[in-house]
Amino acid sequence: LALPTIKQDLNAGNLISLIFTAYFIALVIANPIVGELLSRFKIIYVAIAGLLLFSIGSFMCGLSTNFTMLIISRVIQGFGSGVLMSLSQIVPKLAFEIPLRYKIMGIVGSVWGISSIIGPLLGGGILEFATWHWLFYINIPIAIIAIILVIWTFHFPEEETVAKSKFDTKGLTLFYVFIGLIMFALLNQQLLLLNFLSFILAIVVAMCLFKVEKHVSSPFLPVVEFNRSITLVFITDLLTAICLMGFNLYIPVYLQEQLGLSPLQSGLVIFPLSVAWITLNFNLHRIEAKLSRKVIYLLSFTLLLVSSIIISFGIKLPVLIAFVLILAGLSFGYIYTKDSVIVQEETSPLQMKKMMSFYGLTKNLGASIGSTIMGYLYAIQSGIFGPNLHNVLSAVAVISIGLIVLWVVFF
């Protein structure tokens, strides 16, 4: 909502997309380091540091008088967000037992859907009575309340003692070289051959990383934890995040551009996805008592396949789209929550925090890959079932089929 105003006020021109790019790069850099920090510092200190970074970044964004300052501020804000997003996957394990953990993680996972309604309403209200700077200032009192709650509640008796092991500099360096190559391949739009070469180099670096980390007593990336089940979960989460971007980013665009709905109206159409997400997680322990893990996963992938195909056929009635999104919400609700819990429960207690940090990174990389791929597909003016959104959801359908095959063969 505020991008046109920011672009004009700060003379950003075609560089306006850096507002998102800088934030995302910082977020991805911060994600994996959280696990290492938690092995050396109490979680309460890491959480406060993340909130302070986010608050300082938000404050600086609001004070920005030029585009360079805004981008630097977004990087700081992104670092704070990266820390907090990783903690959102770790804290439920320390604080709650199953089945309550399912409910909490369902609420956490569906926050984006709730924000799709609150965001346009709140943002539009702020821009109606104030300048875009207050879109950032509003984060500060919220962060202060969060810091108070962290100080009050983040005391976990099961938290491990602080590690004294040597820092794995080589593993960290190789890992961030790998991430840098992946990010370049995702963000570069000049010479596509460089993207391909970057992916090839990333694979080579990843192989070196796995070889090195196998022989380190306290590795930055605990590769020994990646058994068949954990590896399958990471792949599933990466692909599911790609699919979620198809729904999260481009169904609202379709509703507004093709069907003429307002941002608030499109948010209301999408909201049933979040309701279904939360509802399923509140009843997940009952479902698991009757069905096996494999069966529920396969049902979830099937629901995602069915919902994407139905919308791909070009339905234009918002009420019907909202109903179909309930199916997608049930699918995403199970996959995301169960993936998180599997990593929490099936990795060793000593490495759980690191693994959950990398899990969060996988989710964010999937979101980045998804937004890029789905953006290209949405821009295509013809497809299997028609233009724009239908290309996006056709890709979701293909990925859903791939996930079904993956779980049938490897689980």
Task: Name what the model sees in each region.
Residues L1-W152, L299-L305, I309-F313, V319-L330, ...:
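Transmembrane-helix bundle of Major Facilitator Superfamily
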Residues F129-T236, C243, V269:
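Hydrophobic transmembrane-helix bundles of small-molecule transporters
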